[in-house]
Amino acid sequence: MEKQNLIDMEGVVTESLPNAMFRVCLDNGCQVLTHISGKIRRNYIRILPGDRVKVELSPYDLTKGRITYRLRTKSSNP
């Protein structure tokens, strides 16, 4: 049951705020206040500043969003 009018973007978490809120800098330079989606919360996926994430934005309010996926970082360990 995916909503079709959402905007998907990628960005980097810049700040961790109380109540599982995060400030994300999107690839286009905008700062967005985001919260975690239910699947990330349920699976205990930890989000830290510096992580690259996918964000869903509503076309009605482009200043708030929801983190839907944490992208893998390229680490030096195999």
UniProtKB/Swiss-Prot annotation:
<keyword id="KW-0934">Plastid</keyword>
<dbReference type="InterPro" id="IPR003029">
    <property type="entry name" value="S1_domain"/>
</dbReference>
<dbReference type="GO" id="GO:0003743">
    <property type="term" value="F:translation initiation factor activity"/>
</dbReference>
<dbReference type="GO" id="GO:0019843">
    <property type="term" value="F:rRNA binding"/>
</dbReference>
<dbReference type="InterPro" id="IPR006196">
    <property type="entry name" value="RNA-binding_domain_S1_IF1"/>
</dbReference>
<feature type="domain" description="S1-like">
    <location>
        <begin position="1"/>
        <end position="72"/>
    </location>
</feature>
<keyword id="KW-0694">RNA-binding</keyword>
<dbReference type="InterPro" id="IPR004368">
    <property type="entry name" value="TIF_IF1"/>
</dbReference>
<keyword id="KW-0699">rRNA-binding</keyword>
<dbReference type="GO" id="GO:0009507">
    <property type="term" value="C:chloroplast"/>
</dbReference>
<protein>
    <recommendedName>
        <fullName>Translation initiation factor IF-1, chloroplastic</fullName>
    </recommendedName>
</protein>
<comment type="function">
    <text>One of the essential components for the initiation of protein synthesis. Stabilizes the binding of IF-2 and IF-3 on the 30S subunit to which N-formylmethionyl-tRNA(fMet) subsequently binds. Helps modulate mRNA selection, yielding the 30S pre-initiation complex (PIC). Upon addition of the 50S ribosomal subunit IF-1, IF-2 and IF-3 are released leaving the mature 70S translation initiation complex.</text>
</comment>
<keyword id="KW-0396">Initiation factor</keyword>
<dbReference type="GO" id="GO:0005829">
    <property type="term" value="C:cytosol"/>
</dbReference>
<dbReference type="InterPro" id="IPR012340">
    <property type="entry name" value="NA-bd_OB-fold"/>
</dbReference>
<comment type="subunit">
    <text>Component of the 30S ribosomal translation pre-initiation complex which assembles on the 30S ribosome in the order IF-2 and IF-3, IF-1 and N-formylmethionyl-tRNA(fMet); mRNA recruitment can occur at any time during PIC assembly.</text>
</comment>
<dbReference type="Pfam" id="PF01176">
    <property type="entry name" value="eIF-1a"/>
</dbReference>
<keyword id="KW-0150">Chloroplast</keyword>
<comment type="similarity">
    <text>Belongs to the IF-1 family.</text>
</comment>
<keyword id="KW-0648">Protein biosynthesis</keyword>
<dbReference type="GO" id="GO:0043022">
    <property type="term" value="F:ribosome binding"/>
</dbReference>
